[in-house]
Amino acid sequence: MEYKFEMGQGKLRVVVPKELDHHLATQLKEEADLLIETYHVKTLIFDFTNTEFMDSSGIGVIMGRYRHIFLLGGEVWAIHTSERMRQILNMSGVTKIIQIYEEGMM
């Protein structure tokens, strides 16, 4: 599965693919940055519903988009994270800068 974007009410939702690695990272971040700038996105949501694997380039995508959104006065969320994805996000330090929401918390 490839990634996809969904826009609405100043929010950009990135449905992260099953595997986010260096093969997709560059394309995903370029497209996300373009959408953030074009639509003045204030909330970026990474949806990990389908994600089973993410390497350091995937972490880089999240961190880079966080910096971009933060400079615009916005925020970044992660939703639908599995236990495995929460471990990856915790170990990488991502959870110190973005919010993780579970079903029904948003």
Give a label for each model feature.
Residues 1-52, 67-106:
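STAS-like cytosolic regulatory interaction modules
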Residues 62-66:
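Histidine-anchored nucleotide/phosphate-binding helix
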